[in-house]
Amino acid sequence: MIDLKLLRENPDAVRRSQLSRGEDPALVDALLTADAARRAVISTADSLRAEQKAASKSVGGASPEERPPLLRRAKELAEQVKAAEADEVEAEAAFTAAHLAISNVIVDGVPAGGEDDYAVLDVVGEPSYLENPKDHLELGESLGLIDMQRGAKVSGSRFYFLTGRGALLQLGLLQLALKLAVDNGFVPTIPPVLVRPEVMVGTGFLGAHAEEVYRVEGDGLYLVGTSEVPLAGYHSGEILDLSRGPLRYAGWSSCFRREAGSHGKDTRGIIRVHQFDKVEGFVYCTPADAEHEHERLLGWQRQMLARIEVPYRVIDVAAGDLGSSAARKFDCEAWIPTQGAYRELTSTSNCTTFQARRLATRYRDASGKPQIAATLNGTLATTRWLVAILENHQRPDGSVRVPDALVPFVGVEVLEPVA
């Protein structure tokens, strides 16, 4: 949720953010109206409750002759209070709906526009232009690493098995990411992958893209698409001690996405699948520290990308492609030779106070007063990275060189085609 103080004092800033995202600025006026209506209803109800309390006291001290009219008035006030409290509930519901409809206010400097309006911040390494390169699926099958056919037989399209050294490659990648996180002060976690609806709402995943989420019918739970969700809910309703700096967590989990809006996109291989594994960094900090923490998360992602030795670029994602919770997002995209394009391997988002406000996560400032915390998240490794590793390290004979950092996990320096 956005900050109501900002909304009331500078609604134009919120309107500009909405326009940069390509979203409706009229939602800002709708929230202002709902906010004013809610406050008016609360004021009326409070006045009636005070009058009812005074009337009740006067009845107790009245003489028998004075009591009948006072009792009638007390009864009238009780009915009015009941009606006013019903109005409060209705006004609160309308206000909450209007509040939830507005995306986070973007950070200054975020490019306006949609998916193609990003800004390139850095390019690392030279893209490889191989003669007749094989794609990751052809390589994965010939090397005995990926089995899409049996994945589809067991579970349907966009499912797969990682087998043999394919499984070791992914496990090694995730262990490498977790070690990097722990070495930098992250607390390792293996979180639940089924969460309550209020946690999904709190993180912003039941908004415009709710159709991407798997729901477990009958249990009222949702499968997460990232461990950002349970980690954001981890401290919901709590007051944190941030006096010694940010709290950092690394979540290792399976992730699930319906890919409902991706019909016909990336149907080959493991670029876009329904289930994958990921190590996600998550940070709680003060709002003043959020931008610095965002840069640090990006730095750790870049360290991981250096370890898998692939060319990549860093982009500043445009406002219309941020998602509702992020105020700014950096993506790292690796070069994929067979596509002749960069594809996303990591995202890191500064969600400012948007998620924490929804989830009632606070900290105490220097004076001891509770304030809304800031939250950030960032990918440290995921299954899709295998695509970049296989394609960028393939050799003319069909083998693939294992990046040096992953050799201890995989057990060989070169992945050879299986008979």
UniProtKB/Swiss-Prot annotation:
SUPFAM superfamilies the UniProt entry points to: Class II aaRS and biotin synthetases, tRNA-binding arm
One Gene Ontology term of the molecular function aspect: serine-tRNA ligase activity
InterPro entries with a match to the protein in the record: aa-tRNA-synt_IIb (IPR002314), aa-tRNA-synth_II (IPR006195), aa-tRNA-synth_II/BPL/LPL (IPR045864), Ser-tRNA-ligase_type_1 (IPR002317), Ser-tRNA-synth_1_N (IPR015866), SerRS_1_N_sf (IPR042103), SerRS_core (IPR033729), tRNA-bd_arm (IPR010978)
Subcellular location: Cytoplasm
Pathway(s) per entry: Aminoacyl-tRNA biosynthesis; selenocysteinyl-tRNA(Sec) biosynthesis; L-seryl-tRNA(Sec) from L-serine and tRNA(Sec): step 1/1
PROSITE patterns in the record: AA_TRNA_LIGASE_II (PS50862)
CDD domains, alphabetized: SerRS_core
Modified residues (N6-acetyllysine): K329
Residues the record lists as binding ATP: R257, R258, E259, V273, E344, L345, T346, S347
Chief location category: cytoplasm
Swiss-Prot/TrEMBL keywords: Acetylation, Aminoacyl-tRNA synthetase, ATP-binding, Cytoplasm, Ligase, Nucleotide-binding, Protein biosynthesis
Residues involved in L-serine binding: T226, S227, E228, E280, T379
Reactions that this protein is recorded to catalyse: tRNA(Ser) + L-serine + ATP = L-seryl-tRNA(Ser) + AMP + diphosphate + H(+); tRNA(Sec) + L-serine + ATP = L-seryl-tRNA(Sec) + AMP + diphosphate + H(+)
Cellular-component GO terms for this entry: cytoplasm; plasma membrane
Pfam families membership: Seryl_tRNA_N (PF02403), tRNA-synt_2b (PF00587)
EC class: ligase
Function text: Catalyzes the attachment of serine to tRNA(Ser). Is also able to aminoacylate tRNA(Sec) with serine, to form the misacylated tRNA L-seryl-tRNA(Sec), which will be further converted into selenocysteinyl-tRNA(Sec).
Subunit-structure text: Homodimer. The tRNA molecule binds across the dimer.
Entry note about domains: Consists of two distinct domains, a catalytic core and a N-terminal extension that is involved in tRNA binding.
Family (UniProt): Belongs to the class-II aminoacyl-tRNA synthetase family. Type-1 seryl-tRNA synthetase subfamily.
Protein name as annotated: Serine--tRNA ligase
Gene behind the chain: serS
